[in-house]
Amino acid sequence: MEMDIQESLLRLLRPLGLQRAEALAGALAREAGASKGLHDSQVLARAHALSVAPVEGRLGDLVWQVRQREHDGAPQVDLRWGLHRLGLDAPSRASTRDLVRAYERRLADRNEPMVYSTLAERVAGSMAEHTSLFQGMAMAVEEARARRSDANRLRENAPWQGWLVGASRAGHEAALLACIGMGADARLPDASGNTPLHHAARFGHFSLVTPLVEAGADVAALNAHGWAPLHLAALHKHARACLHLMAHGANPEQPGWRGRTPTRMHRHEQTQAL
């Protein structure tokens, strides 16, 4: 399994012109196996902190380059200081958003000396839970490179909305808050008309209702099938999600598809259970 992960990482790293790609891929493969359960949204939120504001760095270990073929100079994204500073500045139990902010506070510090051996030692110790960000970063940089875009464009093109949906479906509040903090719109529906609040309600993640509403989510929004978040929570028997939605103004008598209300759907589910 580890070999499969390492080979996958190498395919991502080689096109980036990264030195010591094989050694780095091996280290990342080991860390990937040690960080099970980390949601992609959390990984990508941390990766974003290292991608939106590239710092100057010499060619060498852990320098990710976004190459622009039409220009002689290639912008560089150096992850050495960022990963190191996440470990130094953020508390050991920091939230995803705190980790992002901790890195952002250090972006101006461009002269911190860091070598591969020092970073590797750090990674092998207390940083194991955060090193998954490299895989997400590799994909983000490769995407930007394919578009002949510089590193700053990652901020404009980052698919935060998709990651916000992932966090809403998985129930990861820290990742959700980080995505919103990076500019994801809590009101924006996906291709099926489902907003992040629809996804949270569908899967019964009641703890996400308040942060989504505070970020502007509309409790009355209907998806493409004519369901509001409360309809979905009632349909899937998520009582606590229903209570939280109603506490934020969701109407249990709101008509949806074919005039069905959340109250009617709830009663139907109760009848079916008898």
Swiss-Prot record:
Residues 251-274 are annotated as: Disordered. One of its GO terms (molecular function) is actin filament binding. GO terms for cellular component: extracellular region; periplasmic space. Its main location: secreted. It is found in: Secreted; Periplasm. Pfam families: Ank_2. Keywords: Actin-binding, ANK repeat, Periplasm, Repeat, Secreted. One of its GO terms (biological process) is actin filament organization. This is Actin-binding protein Smlt3054.
